[in-house]
Amino acid sequence: MAVDNDQQATRGDQLLTCWGASEGTAGMANQVRGVALALGVPLELHQTILKYPWRWFPPRFIPWKPEVFVDSAQFTGEPRLVISCGRQGAVASLAWKRQLKDRVFTVNIQDAKVSPDCFDLVCVPEHDDLRGPNVITTLGAVHHMSPARLAEARARGPVHGLERLGPGFVTVLIGGPTRLYAFSESDYQKFSEQLRSLVRAEKRLAILPSRRSDPRWVARLQQDFGRDQYVWDFVSPNPYCEALALGSHLVVTCDSVSMISEAAATEKPLYIAYLAERRAPRRLGQFHRAFEAAGIARPFDGTLAEWTYASPDPTAVVAAAIRDRLRAATVS
């Protein structure tokens, strides 16, 4: 369990006890953290890990009880609001709801593959198929890249190696292999040549691979660009927020809804680097097309242009829905 002390509670929400639940991955925890930050409430973040064999079961087949978790003691409190993300976080939320009933308001981020009616509110991106009276859809995924956080990063300026690039660099975010994208050698050849086109146009690059990135890609990026550009080495602190805030343009590989959504928070020209498909990405393709149709993103071809757009700010949309539903629940 961890408490986010940097969360600033608004006067009306100071007494609202908010717990977060996820299996602890950075992406899921950051989605929970982002919603709590947008609400302006202090967050107590719980890592909810299911015992064996329950961790391998779909949520609908798991008993919604504290006993199925490694740390069942964390279910002794009584939060007013629970924000969960991911399969194991969703089961924890369902367990709290089973215990506390209407005394807790449960919000689940992502489709937990159980009826949305099991939660008070479910939040999913528009490209998911889930719909219902208590389902809120957003353009893109919720995240923790708030305007305030980006402004703080801009004020800090370039750090952790970004200083070498000077102003106006291009931020490049690299995901990793999924069931839809292999990140193959031919993908690398095409993508690296597009990056070289930017270098030939006298652009500086801040290349940030992720924990999911293929080690072969990371090694090649270091070899091909590490000398004259910036490539995060997984040793020094990751200047992710600063790279988003300070980059003039952003290039993001197509595999990650979260990274593309976070990049859109900057309202800067955003390019999606498309890779060869292992199979047709139906829902992810809908997400890409929606971002392009909204004028937020364009396909990356090794050239840059200028355009503007308003951030879809899915986190603020979700926070507003939670406030409205909580207010209605309190009145009733």
Regions found by a protein language model. Give the residues of each.
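Short, basic, low-complexity termini and linkers enriched in Ser/Thr/Gly/Pro
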Residues: 1-14
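Active-site and donor-binding regions of nucleotide-sugar-utilizing enzymes
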Residues: 20-143
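A donor-sugar binding/catalytic signature common to diverse glycosyltransferases
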Residues: 23-25, 240-281
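Short, aromatic/basic amphipathic alpha-helical patches
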Residues: 33-36, 95-97, 121, 216-225, ...
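A nucleotide-sugar donor-handling region in carbohydrate enzymes
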Residues: 116-184, 300-312, 316
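Conserved catalytic-core segment of nucleotide-activated headgroup transferases in glycan assembly
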Residues: 168, 177-208
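Catalytic donor nucleotide-activated moiety binding site of glycosyltransferases and closely related
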Residues: 202-236
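Leloir-type glycosyltransferase catalytic cores
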Residues: 208, 288-332
